[in-house]
Every structure is written in C-alpha cells, then in structure tokens.
Amino acid sequence: MVKLRLKRIGKKQAPFYRIVAADSRVNRNGQYIELVGTFNPLKDEVKIDKELTLKWLNNGAQPTDTVRSLLSKQGILKALHESKFSKNTQTENKKPVSKKTTKKSKDN
C-alpha cells in the first residue's frame, strides 16, 4: 500500500521533512516513490504540490495522521472531497432511461 508520509532530513535539533509517496513496508527514511512536498516545523512552513498530491490520493494512497493534518490545513483534502462529490452529483442527476413496453395491436 502506498502512503503519503513524512521523511525526516536535516540536522539534530533542526528537523526538516519531505512529504513523500512511499511503500508502507519501507522504513521512514528509506526509498520513496515520489516527492510531493516539504514541511519545516521550525518556521511552520509547508509547500505541497497540489496536483501530485491529488493524483496520489485519487490512486488510493493513504496519508498518515500528520500528513492528513497538513493537507487539510492547505485545503487539499477539501478539494479532493469536492472533486469526488461533484462527480457523484453529476452521475446522480442523470436519470436512467427506461424502456417502455409497447403493446402490439392486432388488425382483425
């Protein structure tokens, strides 16, 4: 399963994180599939590529609790919800076409 999670980089007492899409079986600072954004907790600075994040979330990637919090603060989860909701309402608004049965009249 692919997860969106934090990968710690930086020095001691100066944490800096990359927000990455990674296989859940790989360790925290191991290989990752794609870099999605960065997070600097000392300056409370978050930079996230919205398109990449939405791509991974639509493909089934699960964010960790911390990343979910960061995504909601950036408004990305709201955008994901609206995109899914708008797709559902468009399909629900279309009425299914029913076939009407016609009776054949006999000419006698």
From Swiss-Prot:
Residue ranges the record marks as coiled coil: none
GO CC annotation terms, alphabetical: cytoplasm; small ribosomal subunit
Lineage top rank: taxon: Bacteria
InterPro entries referenced in this protein's UniProt entry, alphabetically: Ribosomal_bS16, Ribosomal_bS16_CS, Ribosomal_bS16_dom_sf
Biased composition range(s): Basic residues: 96-108
Keyword Ribonucleoprotein annotated: yes
SUPFAM superfamilies associated with the record: Ribosomal protein S16
Keyword Membrane: no
Keyword line: Ribonucleoprotein, Ribosomal protein
Region described as Disordered: spans on this chain: 82-108
PROSITE patterns: RIBOSOMAL_S16 (PS00732)
GO molecular function, one term: structural constituent of ribosome
GO BP annotations, alphabetical order: translation
Family that this chain belongs to: Belongs to the bacterial ribosomal protein bS16 family.
Name by which UniProt lists this protein: Small ribosomal subunit protein bS16
Organism: Mycoplasma capricolum subsp. capricolum (strain California kid / ATCC 27343 / NCTC 10154)
